[in-house]
Amino acid sequence: MRSSRFVASRVEQGIIAAVLAGCVTMAANAQTVTNNGTGTNSGYFYSLFTSSGKATMTFPEDAQYPGNYAISWSGVGDMVGGKGWSTGGNMSVGYNVGSASGYNTISVYGWTTNPLVEYYITEIGSLYTANAAFKGSVSSDGHTYNTYEHSQVNQPSIEGTATFEQYLDAWGGASIGSNHTVTTGNHFSHWQSLGMNLGSFNYMILATEAYNGASGEVNATVW
């Protein structure tokens, strides 16, 4: 009996250790980002910016789909968040937006430095382009995108408040719930041909943006 009790104790200890290890792993994977932050999750870079209001980012399906993210927001002045890569560049970006509401745009979005440039390749929704200069159009991945350039003066950036250019390729016709591809090099080459120069690539993400007091949510995956 002593031996049996000892063995049972060892088994119980093993079960307890396994449960605790599982809890630690679950806690490590259950990341939550509120309002503002950058970091990594399941090998992907994430970024969340909120000027006002409230936004929360989680990664509910990252165990199966490492590029998955979800954001919920309410009353935001401007919210931009998503998942992708810490360094952008010429890539074939795949994505699927499983569900979305209350957003303005969903885009491949990123920054370069020297020069400081903020860029959008908009897949879903409509960019606000009233004050932007129309530069032409480009065909890529079976779609036609209209190209715009806009100067941002004393606005938030990855380098703090700054003056910089925005490059915008707007399509907006992608469907929710389907797989899509963005060949970023086609857009970058097109911009360069127009004299819209890019610098060194900073992060590049599949970004959801909402503004003007919007409330909503999104669940999307990038790869």
Locations of the language-model features?
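Long, compositionally biased interface segments
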Residues: 178-223
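Extracellular-facing segments of soluble proteins and assemblies that are Gly/Ser/Thr-biased and enriched
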Residues: 78-140
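N-terminal segment immediately downstream of the Sec signal-peptide cleavage site
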Residues: 31-82, 223
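An exposed acidic His-Trp-rich patch
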Residues: 114-177
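Cleavable N-terminal signal peptides
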Residues: 15-18, 28
